[in-house]
């Protein structure tokens, strides 16, 4: 389970060095929901790969439940295949991470020494998340070294979304409390939201409270005030990951632990000048072009959404899903379904733990430029195995709550670089699939 930027880095290395390697990316959105049935359904995708069949494995399981994660890790260890873990130090695996500790330390020292801050709060992401805990440790350790008392070095946890910033400010100001001199945030989403909420309460940033972020997203650079942040080139993580695997394949012994050093960017939100690196007219042009493209795609998606809602069978649902994928910048796709979905009887439920491989069939695909329905699965597997070097196939679960109903496969999904709404699209498909499935079960029960 790896992010778009990391997979982009992997593919870039493969192409730069002419490696005869392709990538199969098994992905889940387990962290998108707290519903245990949904999370279980998402995790089934990781039962699919036979890890021993691969030459190298890249691991990013930071958002998985501990028991589910350990099950996957145990299978990877048993495979004997070299594995590189991203942003989580796992015993027996190579490890690459962002050196967030150093960047947070620099923020704290800068706020203390250059801006005279003496009270601090860390608005953090999920408790237990490895990267977040590293940043919390850097925050607390540095303040301890500076002699800042514990009551002036507080921490709150949330997720990596904007609500965490909003809630942190509300938490600090409830019952007449005042904001500290500085709020150090786990990422830019949190930082921007913290600034907005502080300003609603009458605080000025940076005059009354200073704020820092992390990641250097566009919102950080374009926001007013410009957010002090740390730039992370996540493509470099994927690139370095591929380099480690290539060294292993060539009989070399790379270092077990590697770090990507983020670049600290001081901006207006901590009281420093605008760094002057943004061409605002260029950014505005990009936003205008993007909004026009988004409008076209939104119209197409709305039409497909209506078809999804009106679909009366799973095959109609598949066709509507194919209409959606046809609008996206990719080289092909396949929708694999358990045939029992459409032939449901009360005694014939879908699997909840892994896939019934003998029941999977290709309900629809476009892998060779032509849309087709109901083709043998072996052709899809051959397409993946015989794909040119540098090809990426993204695979994620088609599930109905906890039931393993099938698999989506996207070939070279370039649209992911510019669009981050794939989850919303898939969630729509899964919601309609759940409705169809409930109707079938009701019909089977009545019969």
Where do the language-model regions lie?
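Short loop/turn segments at beta-alpha junctions that line or gate ligand-sensing/allosteric surfaces
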Residues: 340, 363-381, 387, 413
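Helix-loop-beta substructure at the N-terminus of cytosolic sensory domains
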Residues: 307-353
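Short beta-strand-to-loop transition segments that serve as allosteric relay/switch motifs
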Residues: 407-417
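A short, aliphatic-rich beta-strand micro-motif
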Residues: 382-386, 390-399
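Bacterial carbohydrate/catabolite-sensing allosteric modules
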Residues: 1-307, 311, 315, 323-326
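Allosteric cytosolic regulatory segments
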Residues: 423-435
């Amino acid at each position: 389970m790896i992010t778009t930027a990391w997979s982009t880095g992997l593919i870039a290395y493969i192409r730069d060095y002419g490696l005869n390697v392709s990538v199969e990316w098994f992905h889940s959105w387990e962290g998108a929901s707290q519903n245990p049935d949904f999370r279980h359904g998402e995790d089934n995708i990781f039962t699919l790969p036979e890890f021993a069949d691969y030459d190298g494995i890249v691991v990013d399981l930071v958002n998985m439940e501990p028991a589910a994660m350990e099950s996957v890790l145990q299978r990877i260890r048993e495979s004997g295949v070299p594995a590189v873990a991203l942003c989580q130090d796992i015993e027996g695996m190579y490890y690459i991470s962002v050196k967030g500790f150093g960047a947070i330390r620099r923020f704290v020292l800068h706020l203390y020494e250059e801006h005279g801050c003496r009270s601090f709060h860390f608005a953090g992401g999920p408790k237990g998340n490895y990267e977040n805990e590293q940043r919390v440790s850097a925050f607390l350790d540095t303040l301890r070294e500076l002699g800042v008392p514990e009551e002036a070095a507080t921490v709150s946890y949330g997720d990596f979304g904007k609500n965490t910033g909003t809630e942190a400010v509300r938490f600090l100001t409830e019952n007449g409390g005042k904001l500290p001199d500085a709020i150090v945030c786990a990422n830019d989403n949190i930082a921007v939201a913290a600034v907005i909420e502080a300003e609603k309460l009458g605080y000025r940033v940076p005059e009354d409270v200073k704020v820092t972020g992390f990641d250097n997203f566009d919102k950080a650079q374009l926001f007013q005030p410009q957010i002090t942040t740390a730039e992370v080139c996540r493509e470099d993580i994927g690139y370095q990951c591929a380099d480690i695997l290539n060294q292993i394949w060539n009989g070399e012994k790379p270092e077990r632990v590697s770090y990507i050093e983020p670049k600290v960017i001081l901006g207006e939100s901590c009281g420093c000048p605008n760094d002057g690196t943004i061409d605002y007219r260029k950014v505005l042009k990009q936003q205008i072009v993007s909004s026009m493209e988004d409008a076209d795609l939104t119209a197409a998606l709305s039409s497909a959404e209506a078809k999804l809602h009106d679909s009366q069978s799973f095959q109609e649902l598949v066709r509507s899903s194919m209409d959606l994928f046809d609008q996206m910048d990719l080289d092909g796709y396949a929708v694999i379904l358990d045939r029992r979905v459409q032939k449901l009887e009360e005694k014939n439920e879908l699997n909840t733990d892994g896939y019934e491989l003998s029941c999977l069939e290709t309900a629809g695909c476009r892998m060779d430029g032509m849309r087709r329905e109901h083709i043998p699965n072996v052709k899809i597997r051959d397409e993946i195995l015989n794909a040119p070097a540098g090809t990426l196939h993204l695979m994620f679960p088609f599930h109905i709550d906890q039931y393993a109903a099938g698999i989506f496969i996207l070939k070279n999904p370039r649209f992911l670089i510019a669009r981050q709404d794939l989850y919303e699209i898939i969630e729509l498909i899964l919601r309609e699939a759940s409705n169809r499935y409930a109707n079938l079960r009701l019909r089977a029960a009545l019969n």
